Amino acid sequence: AAIKQALDSIAANPGFVSMPNGDIAEQIKSGDVIAGISGVWDVMNVKEAWGENYGACKLPTYTVAGKEVQMSSFTGYKMMGVNSYSKNKEWACRLADWLTNQQNQELRFKEKNQGPSNSKAAESEEIKKVAAIQAIIAQSQYGTLQRVGNSYWDACKKFANTVLSGNNGGLSDQEVMDTLVNEITASAVK
């Protein structure tokens, strides 16, 4: 219940606005959003709106039951795979090697500001200067590997809508939290 109350407090703040993924970029460009929480997928939009000197940091802390708690996040990675049963396996392997080589990962970084997965490309001094990548590195100690199914996203969307509406639908805060947990952990097989 304390977590639900903390989230209610955040959502009730007049400076807080929730918006669908993708909308934050448009709101930044229009000047309606001056700070926000998003992912590296929005870096190019942020750079376009705010310039090269934009700032980025790890997620903030918030207060739950009188204690400061660090917001957590999901972490993930990009992976290049090749189907071993492909009739063009050799060409698929060559394409994977080409896409993940140092030169192309450096090009991807330059054009998309995405951190490279190639270890040699990742050693670049230029990467150490990118605020968004440094923020991800700082946040990574609070992250959890993203291994969730659709039941997680559906349950969290329903929970977020409840928090944002300020209406528990007659349920106590604890009942709302219990429903969230039950829906996340429910088997996909019915």
Per-segment meaning from a language model:
Residues A1, V69, F74-N83, W153-L164:
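Periplasmic solute-binding protein
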Residues E48-E111:
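Extracytoplasmic/periplasmic substrate-recognition and gating elements
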Residues I34-G39, G55-A56:
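Paired acidic/hydrophobic, glycine-rich loop segments that form the ligand-binding mouth/hinge
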Residues A2-A6, I24, D42, N88-A92, ...:
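Stable alpha-helical elements in mature extracytoplasmic
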Residues G22-D32, G36, S165-G169:
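Short helices/loops that flank or line small-molecule/ion binding pockets
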Residues I137-K190:
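Conserved C-terminal helix/tail region of periplasmic/extracytoplasmic solute-binding proteins
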Residues A25, D42-A49, T185:
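Pocket-flanking alpha-helical
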Residues A1-P20:
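Glycine-centered hinge/linker elements that transmit conformational signals in sensory
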